[in-house]
């Protein structure tokens, strides 16, 4: 008899060449996996018979279970006696989905996606909107990576006072990037003074006349803050070692049964909050050029960590056929893979269309992060006038 492992390696390609019994084992595995993903509960022989396999006796199903368990595709739940698919079974199930017709996407979802912009200069903000919508539909945390876009321009500055000698500055750009800094104020300032300085700098950035009359002290402080913020911004813009990462919806994990276990929740949150690891997964997904699932132990094998007990799916997005980054979702092991995969593809296609339209209309270009060796150089330091970043908005935004 052909072993279960050989049957599964071939998946659908092997169906026409194997015995009816071996094909039935494959059906049992996928039916068990699908039922587990739907309910999140261990699957018993009686439940499987009632749901998918009415032509088989419970004894026959248990025999198939035993064979699949011996091959490492199912594990027994000691409380209920039902079976749970292993990471290996889930991997074969996900690979199998590529051979199946994609699940239908409802009209309301298409309507929501159609409301996303068809072209835009505010690229990062629109990518955030798209991933927020994806997370809302799937009820899962979402994230995406992005390169730095050339010819961006600073459009606004906000200053929030923390106390009399500390303030948080927020810079926003035309392409939707946001940068924050906490700055030390050389002299104590009151709230009204900070607000006058903020309004003065907002007009200064936009080359607009200002009605704010600043004292000598406030004028000196405003330019001191401006110079500090601009230098920090240019440093970030010109020197970055990894793609920008944007994440949202972390609290959605709390809705899932698996994450009610404090240890599993801590591992999942730890992964989601680790920028380096998330960027690594997105980078792998981007270079694979297709939707890629990382399931359970696969994550620990790639990242060199303990098994986080969750799954991640990523998919690349493009601008004029050039890969820009990837977007993804994170959730429990029993993710709704059948629904999530086509939805991710749909969102990626929409983003591709928007970015390609924007590429031609706004002449967009971008830069990848560069890793550099920390060595002293005799070359002159990069001067700001040679940078493609602009401190003032382009004419189209004025």
Curated annotation (Swiss-Prot):
SUPFAM superfamilies registered for this protein in UniProt: GAF domain-like (SSF55781), Winged helix' DNA-binding domain (SSF46785)
InterPro entries attached to this UniProt entry: GAF-like_dom_sf, HrcA, HrcA_C, WH-like_DNA-bd_sf, WH_DNA-bd_sf
Key words of the record: Repressor, Stress response, Transcription, Transcription regulation
Any one Gene Ontology BP term: negative regulation of DNA-templated transcription
An example molecular function term from Gene Ontology annotations: DNA binding
Function: Negative regulator of class I heat shock genes (grpE-dnaK-dnaJ and groELS operons). Prevents heat-shock induction of these operons.
Family assignment from sequence similarity: Belongs to the HrcA family.
Protein name, as recorded: Heat-inducible transcription repressor HrcA
Species of the source: Chlamydia pneumoniae
């Amino acid at each position: 008899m052909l072993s279960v492992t050989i049957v599964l390696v071939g998946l659908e390609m092997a169906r026409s060449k194997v015995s009816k019994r071996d094909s039935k084992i494959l059906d049992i595995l996928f039916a068990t996996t699908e039922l587990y993903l739907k309910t999140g509960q261990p699957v018993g022989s009686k439940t499987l018979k009632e749901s998918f396999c009415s032509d088989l006796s419970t004894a026959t199903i248990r025999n198939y279970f035993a064979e699949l368990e011996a091959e490492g595709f199912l594990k027994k739940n000691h409380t209920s006696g039902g079976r749970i698919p292993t990471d290996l079974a889930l991997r074969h199930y996900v690979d199998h989905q590529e051979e199946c017709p994609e699940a239908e996407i409802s009209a309301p979802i298409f309507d929501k996606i159609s409301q996303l912009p068809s072209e835009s200069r505010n690229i990062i903000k629109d990518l955030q909107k798209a991933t927020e919508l994806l997370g809302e539909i799937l009820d899962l945390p979402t994230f995406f990576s992005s390169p730095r876009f050339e010819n961006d321009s600073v459009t606004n500055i906000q200053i929030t006072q923390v106390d009399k000698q500390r303030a948080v500055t927020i810079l926003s750009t035309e392409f939707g990037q946001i940068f924050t800094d906490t700055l030390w104020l050389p002299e104590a300032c009151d709230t009204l003074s900070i607000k006058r300085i903020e309004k003065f700098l907002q007009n200064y950035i936009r080359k607009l006349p200002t009605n704010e009359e600043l004292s000598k002290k406030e004028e000196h402080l405003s330019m001191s803050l401006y110079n500090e913020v601009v230098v920090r911004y240019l440093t970030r813009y010109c020197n970055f070692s990894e793609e920008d990462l944007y994440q949202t919806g972390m609290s959605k994990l709390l809705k899932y049964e698996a994450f009610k276990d404090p240890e599993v929740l801590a591992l999942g949150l730890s992964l989601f909050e680790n920028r380096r690891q998330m960027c690594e997964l997105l980078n792998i997904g981007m270079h694979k050029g297709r939707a890629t699932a990382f399931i359970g132990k696969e994550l620990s094998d790639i990242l060199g960590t303990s098994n986080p007990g969750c799954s991640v799916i990523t998919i690349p997005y493009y601008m004029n056929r050039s890969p820009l980054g990837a977007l993804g979702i994170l959730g429990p092991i029993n993710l709704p893979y059948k629904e999530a995969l086509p939805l991710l593809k749909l969102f990626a296609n929409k983003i591709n269309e928007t970015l390609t339209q924007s590429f031609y209309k706004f002449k967009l270009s971008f830069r990848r992060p560069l890793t550099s060796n920390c060595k002293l150089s005799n070359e002159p330091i990069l001067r700001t006038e040679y940078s493609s970043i602009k401190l003032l908005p382009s004419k189209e935004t004025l």
